[in-house]
Amino acid sequence: MSTLQDFQIAPAILHRVTVRDASAILFCTLLTVFLFISQGTVRGVKRVGKSRLRTLVTGETPLRFDLEKYGYLGYQQFSKKANKPFLVKIYGLDHYVLPVKYLDSLKTVDHHRLSFAQSLNDFLNVDASLGDLVTHSDMEIAVVTKHLNPRLTTLTPVLVDEANFAFEKELGKLETWKTVNALFLSAFLTNRTSGRVLVGDLCRDDNYLHAMMKYTESVFSSGVAFNGIPLGPFRKIVYYLGARQHRRDLDNAAALVLPEIKRRMAAQAEDPNCRKENDAIQWNLDLPLASPKEGLPLRHAHRVLHLSFAATGTVAILITHMIYNVLMYPEYLEPLREEVMACTKAHGGWTEKAMNEMWKLDSFIRETLRVQPPSVFTAYRTVKNQPFTFPDGFTLPVGSRITFPTLPVGLDPENYESASEFDGFRFFRKREEARLAKKAYNWGATKIDSSFLPFGYGNQACPGRFFGVRKTKILFGKLINDYDFSWAEPRSARPENIVIEGQILVNPTPEIKIKSRVAAGM
């Protein structure tokens, strides 16, 4: 339905109104059209979805909760059939959803032309709480690429140690069945384990843990709260006013990080050769400053907390998806356990070599991401500084937002055999085939290609995926090795996901029964 059709007014009403009334109606109609209709879209690109007014009038599911459906429709009708973009509102903003033929441009074009940070800032309204933190510099990315990723091998024992503490703290030795919420368990395990690398010893301070989790949980809810309202030019001010509680959560968490940041800054000022910790707080302090304000203690605190948001939420959701999958497909549980036990026994525990040989677990992670990716769409970018032209001549004006159809691509039968079915060892078999044929294996859980986009694509793909997959292996591997678990209540179907603004969120309500395994070996 055309958006203009949503604003038709019955002639029977019009002939009874005065000139003043008509002027008021005309003004309100024009204002509403201004707010409801996107400006400056590229001619010839078709829109999918439904207007906000239509869903209000008809009672249909609003588009922001129905993007899985319209992502598929647009993919089939435009991306696949015509190899063309389509337009859809995501996060209340127009996005061009591009066919995969345009992915290669993301490999070479830098963030000054096509910016993921600008997209993130705009669709989650990050500036309502953190100002220009994610757009002013790439220091947050540099913490991951220049410090975290090169240290992952040496950080493995640290992660394992903290995972052991997290399991002891959250579960301990359970001789009888205990009922827990699956997502809450995953979230606490993930946040405790991640925290050791992000904030060092502060991770074991429960006051900090709860304050940080309250902040990270409100990033998404605060960032999308008003997207169902056509705010137009008032979007930023409305989100700023609406984010007061979120900013309070941020302040509370920052107040617990700031003393440690200030202590270290003072120690380094007194003695540049002083002992340094091996965590994200220190890596922030060691980075060259993009500008003087990036060196302020509060700015460092905000960067650490935003990194915590990025490092924990998606991993907790992924682990919960994996719990649901292994309960719905129990035939995978024992082979996964056997692999974990064999690898840890052969290599003396959760070592780098042990994890590198957990091929079935790696496959299970990748298949979960294929079927239940973090979002219907990924590889978001915003055109900056000047119009951007793709190799085939398709041109987008400055300010245009693009993305790619991750879930439809992952479930496309042209990309995967029996694509709609969950096959936990799909990529393990590919690995075995490659090994027997003496060919390179390109289907590891962190490997990105044009048919696997959960981590984005190109030179701004998720740099934290290596850290995320490593934590997932440790936490899920220890969970299945050390504990038995089942649904708290019998289920015949997998809990339905919740999709908001294209984000695929795990159903937060299911509970599981859990107890220690008698045969647990590690």
From Swiss-Prot:
InterPro entries (alphabetical):
Cyt_P450, Cyt_P450_E_grp-IV, Cyt_P450_sf
> Does the keyword section mention Acetylation?
no
| Gene3D superfamilies linked to this entry | Cytochrome P450
Its membrane topology is listed as: Multi-pass membrane protein
Which pathway, per its entry? Answer: Mycotoxin biosynthesis
UniProt KW Iron keyword: yes
| Localization | Membrane
Which positions bind heme?
C462
Class in the EC hierarchy, top level: oxidoreductase
Alphabetically, the GO molecular function entries are: heme binding; iron ion binding; monooxygenase activity; oxidoreductase activity, acting on paired donors, with incorporation or reduction of molecular oxygen
Q: Which Pfam families match?
A: p450
**What GO CC terms are in its UniProt record?**
membrane
Q: Which chain regions cross the lipid bilayer?
A: 22-42, 304-324
Q: Cite the EC number.
A: 1.-.-.-
Q: Give the GO biological process terms.
A: secondary metabolic process
Cofactor(s) required for function per UniProt:
heme
**Source organism's superkingdom?**
Eukaryota
Coiled-coil region list:
none
Q: Which family does it belong to?
A: Belongs to the cytochrome P450 family.
Functionally, this protein is described as follows: Cytochrome P450 monooxygenase; part of the gene cluster that mediates the biosynthesis of sirodesmin PL, an epipolythiodioxopiperazine (ETP) characterized by a disulfide bridged cyclic dipeptide and that acts as a phytotoxin which is involved in the blackleg didease of canola. SirD catalyzes the O-prenylation of L-tyrosine (L-Tyr) in the presence of dimethylallyl diphosphate (DMAPP) to yield 4-O-dimethylallyl-L-Tyr, and therefore represents probably the first pathway-specific enzyme in the biosynthesis of sirodesmin PL.
Protein's name in the database:
Cytochrome P450 monooxygenase sirB
Q: What is the species listed in this Swiss-Prot or TrEMBL entry? A: Leptosphaeria maculans
Instruction: Give the source lineage, highest ranks first.
Output: Eukaryota, Fungi, Dikarya, Ascomycota, Pezizomycotina
Gene that codes for this?
Answer: sirB
